[in-house]
């Protein structure tokens, strides 16, 4: 069906009329949201907020937590719940986030991305085009929740399905909605050819039509960055300039930093049990298993790096979907799975080797930590949008995975460690600015 949300809801309503209560699906009948039992919400909570965070990265979860923490200071009785997938649910549990119980029924976006990936390769646009059934399945769960519970505000951080299907069917909207994103539209990879350029242009045209045909559907649209972070150029042939269009339809907050107040670096290093004199290198590849190839390439470079940097201590953060047992670790290398305070390690270490995700690279930039980043091949955000943003801060060194050897990785590490010019400062109030905009909707 061209309009699967509407068809599914018609089928649901038809079945509801003809099934007994015992036969009906339990979806929509939920127990109390899960979270830290010490967190208690007043029965007279001023507002109920449903946060819907993208499944694509833990960094997006960290920024949403930062925004939520500010919201709680502005509205002490607020009830914030997350509709989220693993591994984000683990991050939320570690930070007292309340997870809506329907989250356990969500289809896995992370598993889909992993199935679409190759050796340090992920054609993000093509992967998105092939996840329709995941988007619609998760939207149906979302719609059941907002129809059966009284939420005052939905905060959709790159929750593409929610935004798309509510725009297609505005009558389904049940609460105020705030759209949060760190990118506007799709960009074709230069090497992908004319077909991808035509397809991204069509997707962008549909997005523009949705927003301009229903200008009041989004109660606010927040770009998590600054106007300069949008690359120059149009959305495609015959379409508006992306930056100019975004300036008309978005409010800009700067990037919300989870590590905005991590404290003095020496104290932070001590709290993480980093020893004086160590040169700590953190390797981090995000919340999916796509980064396994990058970890192996970096591990192969470790013996050379250790020879050149005798005080080197390498800590690999494999992430929640990769077991440390997966890797043949050289002597002296530590490997950890899920680390809920990764942002602190990124702020405290001497150098980081990471994938090309925006959240991680911006956290490193804000902390002033030197880093190398290896964008996933074919991933337009990591190859086009992230480097464009980082250039404004003179931060990070972009490395091409396919061209990187052990020697070139070590040489780049040495150059970054000895670099004297500091990165440009990053605004620290992005979470506060975003939360204040959201607060106006409560």
Residues covered by each model-derived region:
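A nucleotide-sugar donor-handling region in carbohydrate enzymes
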Residues: 187-289, 319-321
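Donor-nucleotide binding loops and adjacent catalytic segments primarily
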Residues: 253-351
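Active-site proximal beta-strand in glycosyltransferases
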Residues: 170-188
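Conserved nucleotide-sugar phosphate-binding/catalytic loop shared by glycosyltransferases and other
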Residues: 74, 78-130
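A short, glycine/small-residue-rich beta-strand->loop->alpha-helix junction that serves as a flexible
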Residues: 53-65, 291-293
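A donor-sugar binding/catalytic signature common to diverse glycosyltransferases
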Residues: 341-385
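Conserved nucleotide-sugar donor-binding subdomain of glycosyltransferases
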Residues: 116-163
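Catalytic active-site module of serine/aspartate enzymes centered on a nucleophile-bearing elbow/loop
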Residues: 1-32
């Amino acid at each position: 069906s061209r309009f699967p949300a509407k068809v599914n809801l018609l089928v649901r309503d038809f079945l509801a009329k003809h099934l007994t209560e015992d036969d009906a699906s339990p979806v929509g009948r939920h127990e109390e949201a899960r979270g830290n039992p010490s967190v208690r919400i007043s029965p007279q909570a001023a507002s109920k907020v449903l946060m819907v965070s993208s499944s694509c990265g833990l960094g997006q979860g960290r920024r949403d937590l930062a925004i939520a923490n500010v919201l709680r200071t502005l509205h002490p009785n607020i009830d914030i719940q997350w509709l989220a997938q693993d591994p984000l649910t683990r991050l939320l549990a570690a930070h007292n986030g309340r997870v809506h119980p329907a989250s356990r029924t969500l289809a896995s976006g992370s598993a889909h991305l992993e199935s679409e990936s190759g050796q340090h390769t992920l054609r993000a646009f093509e992967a998105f085009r092939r996840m329709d059934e995941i988007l619609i399945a998760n939207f149906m769960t979302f719609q059941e929740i907002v129809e059966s519970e009284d939420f005052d505000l939905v905060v959709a951080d790159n929750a593409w399905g929610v935004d798309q299907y509510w725009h297609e069917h505005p009558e389904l909207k049940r609460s105020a909605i705030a759209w949060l994103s760190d990118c506007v539209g799709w960009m074709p990879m230069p090497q992908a050819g004319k077909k991808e350029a035509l397809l991204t242009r069509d997707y962008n045209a549909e997005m523009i039509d949705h927003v301009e045909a229903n200008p009041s559907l989004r109660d606010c649209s927040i770009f998590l960055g600054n106007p300069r972070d949008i690359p120059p150029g149009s959305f495609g042939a015959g379409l508006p300039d992306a930056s100019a269009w975004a300036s008309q339809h978005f409010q800009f907050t700067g990037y919300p930093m989870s590590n905005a107040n991590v404290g003095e670096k020496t104290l932070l290093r001590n709290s993480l049990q980093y020893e004086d004199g160590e040169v700590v290198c953190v390797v981090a590849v995000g919340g999916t298993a796509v980064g396994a190839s990058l970890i192996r390439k970096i591990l192969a470079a470790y013996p050379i790096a250790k020879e050149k940097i005798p005080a080197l201590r390498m800590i690999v953060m494999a992430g929640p979907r990769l077991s440390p047992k997966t890797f043949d670790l050289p002597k002296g290398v530590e490997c950890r799975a899920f680390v809920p305070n990764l942002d602190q390690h990124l702020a405290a270490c001497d150098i980081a080797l990471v994938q090309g995700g925006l959240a991680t690279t911006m956290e490193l930039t804000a902390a002033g930590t030197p880093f190398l980043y290896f964008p996933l091949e074919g991933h337009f955000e990591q190859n086009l949008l992230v480097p464009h943003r980082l250039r404004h801060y003179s931060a990070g060194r972009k490395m091409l995975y396919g061209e990187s050897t052990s020697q070139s990785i070590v040489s780049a590490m040495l150059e970054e460690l000895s670099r004297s010019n500091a990165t440009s400062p990053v605004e620290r109030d992005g979470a506060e600015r975003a939360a204040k905009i959201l607060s106006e909707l409560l």
